[in-house]
Regions:
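Acidic, proline/glycine-rich low-complexity intrinsically disordered segments
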Residues: 1-197
Length: 197
């Protein structure tokens, strides 16, 4: 912490939903202006911000940069759409490509970048699923489910550097609505509240 340096990256006052690339070279953020939102990217070594996706009638709900920093993955609500969709966008600008629908958290990548994990809320019965899909959005599958008294929150999960576990926030209605972190074994789908053996 002695060598930590804090720098202001934007000064407009309308930036939200930011993410940094795994190699620390890029920062992506959302700008909201006039009821529309756009996606911007910046090289940390420079002071210039580049518009990656122009303003549109969307609400970005989470942004993540891929492991190799070539793509930005952003979940977004279009207009009055009830469910968020996941888009893959070339990091330095290009046309967004919809790769998934019905996603309720930012994604988190596996260490090799071949897959990502995300949360999908379930309305009835109340709950949420922790989902895994390939980097192109194909092959989605349920890694773990939560229903009833302990439910995954719509927050970004975190894939462990060794690839064996995923951590996800959850709320426990058995413990007066307290929240915590649960780990999920990628191979078996077994869940365990963090700190318990």
């Amino acid at each position: 912490l002695d060598n930590m340096r804090i720098s202001r990256l934007t000064s407009t006052g309308n930036a939200r939903q930011a993410a940094i690339s795994p190699d620390g070279r890029y920062v992506v953020h959302v700008v909201r202006e006039g009821g529309q939102e756009s996606l911007w990217i910046r090289q940390t070594a420079t002071t210039s911000n580049v518009e990656s996706v122009p303003p549109a009638d969307v609400r970005y709900d989470g942004v993540t940069i891929s492991q190799d920093a070539t793509y930005v993955y952003c979940s977004a609500y279009e207009g009055t759409q009830a469910f968020s969709s996941l888009y893959q966008v070339p990091a330095l600008g290009g046309t967004p490509r919809k790769i998934l629908e019905d996603i309720d958290s930012p994604v988190s990548f596996s260490p090799d970048g071949s897959e990502f994990v995300f949360v999908r809320g379930i309305i009835e019965p109340r709950g949420a699923d922790l989902m895994v899909a390939r980097a192109d959005g194909s092959g989605e599958r349920v890694l773990a489910s939560s229903r009833g008294s302990e439910i995954f929150l719509n927050e970004q999960p975190s894939w462990a550097p060794d690839g064996t576990q995923v951590a996800v926030a959850y709320v426990s209605y058995l413990k007066n609505g307290n929240s915590g972190v649960m780990t999920i074994d990628v191979a078996s789908g077994a869940t365990r509240p963090l700190g318990e053996t």
